[in-house]
């Protein structure tokens, strides 16, 4: 009963504060702020559902050849974001925006700027990797 009451109170707040309407405007702003990323030579797709946006990086845009997972290109974007004070979510070579509902249009613009910079950095050079770079329990048999 207590959890249900809390859920109903949350729904009341969403209705009173017009959270869904505000999110529609913010998601539209997010789409506009990130639209230029679709033109990046290493971005296959920018996709969005509501307040969740994903940017998929690839080696070759025409063939949509993915980066090897071992290169962890998304992690490079994430690390750049942290250095700039932004939290982006990497999953392989896909970088996600998962902002809180209280984000402002200016903060969305900042996320788009940081993501663009991070993608430039992550896709600039070839990456040399070893399995031991990614798994702490990896033991070199040699």
Which role fits each region the language model picked out?
Residues 1-142:
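Conserved N-terminal phosphate-binding loop of PLP-dependent enzymes in the Aspartate aminotransferase
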